[in-house]
A protein has these predicted regions:
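N-terminal membrane-targeting/insertion segments
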Residues: 1-8
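Compact alpha/beta protein-protein interaction domains typified by the UBC
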Residues: 10-113, 135
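Acidic/negatively charged segments and metal-coordination signatures
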Residues: 1, 98-107, 111-240
């Protein structure tokens, strides 16, 4: 009988992560959860910014329902201040929840998550720490930043239309396609932005978008209260 823990770690590419970043290790965690601790080193650069060779002490927390739940990451060496893109409890703000979910849906690999989400964040701080501009840009605080990121995902310029698009994404395809497109074109969605919305809905499911509308903690709607006023980094690929 296949050990379910070993099978889970194989699906997540846990061994590949620990083999590539040899100073990371698994540490004790509550049953069903996983915790990775240690030092991660990297060498990376982006166009217009210098190559950075650096290392950080981090902790990565994987919930029992990973990859449905986004991993939580801390820098534990006392180097990154609370004022730099942090969530509650000192977790790193790696990007918008929807952007991170899209990455995890494509692959449950924790190696992929570290290289696409964690290292770009650490690289950005290394640049910022020495007076440079953030290489991947940043989002505004609170709900506005989440709308800005969604506008980027949807390929639209008007972030005020985002809430309407999310409502359409929370519906079934057939129902949504019969309704007016949220872009203001006066065309029904089925003749306008349907391809991009269908791709997002197929990736994350309409329940994900319904949760953005219904949960105050998601801080997505214009009038939702914000319990954490942080700024998110935008994510991008870079050479390493």
């Amino acid at each position: 009988m296949i050990d379910p823990v070993r099978q889970r770690f194989a699906n997540w590419q846990m061994e590949e992560l620990l083999a590539k970043y040899v100073d990371l290790r698994l540490s004790p965690a509550p049953k069903g959860e996983s915790r990775i601790t240690g030092r991660i080193g990297f060498s990376a650069e982006t166009p217009g910014h210098r190559r950075v060779v650096d290392e950080y002490d981090i902790q990565i927390f994987l919930a029992s329902n990973y990859p449905k739940a986004i991993p939580l990451v801390r820098e534990v060496g006392g180097r990154i201040p609370k004022t730099f893109h942090k969530l509650e409890a000192d977790y790193l703000c790696l990007g918008s929840p929807t952007r991170l979910r899209l990455i995890l849906v494509k692959s449950p690999s924790i190696l992929n998550f570290v290289e696409q989400c964690v290292i770009p964040y650490l690289y950005s701080y290394s640049i910022f720490e020495h007076g440079g501009s953030l290489p991947f840009g940043e989002l505004s605080h609170g709900p506005l930043g989440l709308r800005e990121d969604f506008a980027s995902l949807l390929g639209i310029d008007n972030d005020d239309a985002v809430l309407g698009f999310v409502k359409l994404l929370s519906m079934g395809k057939r129902q949504a396609n019969k309704l007016p497109c949220a872009c203001g074109s006066h065309l029904r969605l089925g003749r306008c932005h349907h391809r991009r919305l269908n791709a997002l809905r197929n990736s994350l499911g309409r329940r994900w978008f319904a949760s953005l509308l219904s949960s105050p903690d998601a801080r997505f709607g214009r009038n939702f209260p914000s319990r954490r006023q942080t700024t998110s980094l935008t994510l991008a690929r870079f050479a390493n």
